[in-house]
C-alpha cells in the first residue's frame, strides 16, 4: 500500500540525501527525444499556434518529386507535365500519468509535503519521457523504408525484414558500409543513427581508433550522430533479429517530435481545492523543451489507511502532453528516409 508509513515519525529517522537516492530514480537515456525536439521547426514552424484544439487536425504541404521524361531529341512542339504537392497530416498521441496525495500525509512524517509532491511529479515526468522515447523508436522502426535500389553494394536488402544486412565479419566496417548504402540512395549529408546495445560498444571501439592508431577506423563516424538506445534490439526489432545488432539511420533533420498541450492548460484556470479543480502547465524538470499539462482537483477522503487522517482531503493530479512524431514523407509507395541495418552472421 502506498502510504508513506515507512518514513512516518515513529522512530528516530533522517532523510536520505538525493544523490544516494539516484539508483532508485534512474532514467533510461533518451538522446533521440532531445534530437527530435530540436528538429521540430524543420518539419513545420510554430505548430502550437496552428493547432488550437484536440479536435483540429494539422496538415502540411510539400512538393512531390517530378518524374524523369528521359528525352533524347529536341523538338518544336514538346509538352510537359505540371508538378504537384502532397498533403502531410500530423498524427497525435497523448501521454498521461496520474498521481495523488492526501493533505495530512506529511503531518507526522520526516518528509515534507512539498518534497513528496515534487518527487512524485519528477518520477511521473521520467515515466512520460521514457514512454515517449520508446514510442519514437517504435515509430521509426515501423516507418522504415520497404524500398531499395535493385542493386546494393556492401549490404543485402532483406525484403522480409525491410533491413539492410551487413555480414558480422565486416563489423569493423559496419558504419562505413552503412554510409555507403545511404550514399547509394542519394543521402550524402549528416546522419542520425540509433544503435542498440550490441552495436553501441562497436561504435565506441571504432570511435577510439583514430589517425594515431595503427588501424584508423574512426573516419567512418564522420558526420554521424550516434545515439545508443537500448529499446532498440530489446523491445523493438527483436522478432527479426533476436541476437540484436540493429541500427536505424536517417538523414539529419528528417524526423521530429512535436509536443503540444491544449490552450486551457496553457492559459490556466480554476481552483485546486474544489471538485472542479485547476488547469495549469509546468516545465520539464530535466531541461527539455517540453511543457506538460497539469490537471488537479480535490475530494473529501478517508486517508487513515494511507498515512493521512480519517477526515482528510485527497488531491488528484494528472500530467500529460500530446505529441506528433513526424517523419519526412516521400511520394513513392512504401519508401521513407528511414533505413534499418542489422549485423548478421
State where each predicted segment sits.
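Sequence/fold signature of self-assembling virion shell proteins
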Residues: 2-3, 163-169, 205-345
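Assembly/oligomerization interface modules of large self-assembling protein complexes
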Residues: 27-97
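Short, internal active-site loops enriched in acidic
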Residues: 144-146, 198-201, 285
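Extended low-polarity, hydrophobic cluster-rich segments
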Residues: 101, 182, 190, 199, ...
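Alpha-helical scaffold segments that mediate packing/assembly in large oligomeric complexes
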Residues: 104-184, 340, 344-345
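Structured, hydrophobic secondary-structure cores that serve as assembly/anchoring elements
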Residues: 173-214
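N-terminal alpha-helical "arm" segments
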Residues: 1-48, 340-345
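Residues forming anionic-ligand binding surfaces in small-molecule and nucleic-acid pockets
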Residues: 93-107
Amino acid at each position: 500500500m502506498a502510504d508513506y508509513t515507512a518514513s512516518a515519525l515513529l522512530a528516530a529517522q533522517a532523510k536520505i540525501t538525493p544523490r544516494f537516492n539516484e539508483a532508485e530514480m534512474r532514467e533510461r537515456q533518451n538522446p533521440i527525444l532531445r534530437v527530435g525536439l530540436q528538429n521540430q521547426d524543420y518539419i513545420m514552424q510554430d505548430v502550437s499556434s496552428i493547432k488550437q484544439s484536440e479536435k483540429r487536425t494539422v496538415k502540411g504541404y510539400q512538393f512531390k518529386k517530378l518524374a524523369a521524361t528521359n528525352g533524347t531529341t529536341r523538338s518544336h512542339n514538346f509538352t510537359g507535365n505540371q508538378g504537384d504537392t502532397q498533403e502531410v497530416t500530423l498524427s497525435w498521441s497523448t501521454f498521461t500519468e496520474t498521481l495523488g496525495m492526501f493533505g495530512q500525509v506529511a503531518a507526522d512524517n520526516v518528509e515534507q509535503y512539498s518534497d513528496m509532491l515534487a518527487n512524485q511529479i519528477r518520477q511521473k515526468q521520467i515515466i512520460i519521457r521514457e514512454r515517449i522515447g520508446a514510442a519514437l523508436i517504435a515509430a521509426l522502426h515501423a516507418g522504415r523504408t520497404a524500398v531499395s535500389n535493385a542493386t546494393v553494394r556492401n549490404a543485402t536488402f532483406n525484403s522480409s525484414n525491410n533491413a539492410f544486412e551487413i555480414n558480422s565479419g565486416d563489423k569493423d566496417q559496419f558504419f562505413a558500409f552503412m554510409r555507403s548504402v545511404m550514399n547509394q540512395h542519394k543521402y550524402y549529408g549528416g546522419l542520425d543513427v540509433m544503435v542498440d546495445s550490441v552495436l553501441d560498444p562497436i561504435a565506441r571501439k571504432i570511435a577510439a581508433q583514430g589517425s594515431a592508431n595503427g588501424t584508423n577506423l574512426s573516419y567512418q563516424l564522420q558526420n554521424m550522430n550516434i545515439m545508443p538506445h537500448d529499446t532498440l534490439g530489446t523491445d523493438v526489432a527483436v522478432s527479426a533479429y533476436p541476437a540484436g545488432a540493429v541500427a536505424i539511420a536517417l538523414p539529419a533533420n528528417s524526423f521530429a517530435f512535436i509536443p503540444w498541450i491544449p490552450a486551457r492548460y496553457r492559459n490556466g484556470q480554476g481552483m485546486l481545492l474544489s471538485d472542479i479543480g485547476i488547469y495549469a502547465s509546468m516545465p520539464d524538470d530535466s531541461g527539455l523543451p517540453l511543457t506538460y499539462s497539469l490537471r488537479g482537483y480535490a475530494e473529501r477522503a478517508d486517508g487513515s489507511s494511507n498515512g493521512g487522517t480519517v477526515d482528510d482531503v485527497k488531491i488528484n493530479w494528472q500530467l500529460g502532453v500530446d505529441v506528433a512524431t513526424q517523419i519526412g514523407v516521400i511520394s513513392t509507395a512504401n519508401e521513407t528516409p528511414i533505413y534499418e541495418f542489422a549485423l548478421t552472421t
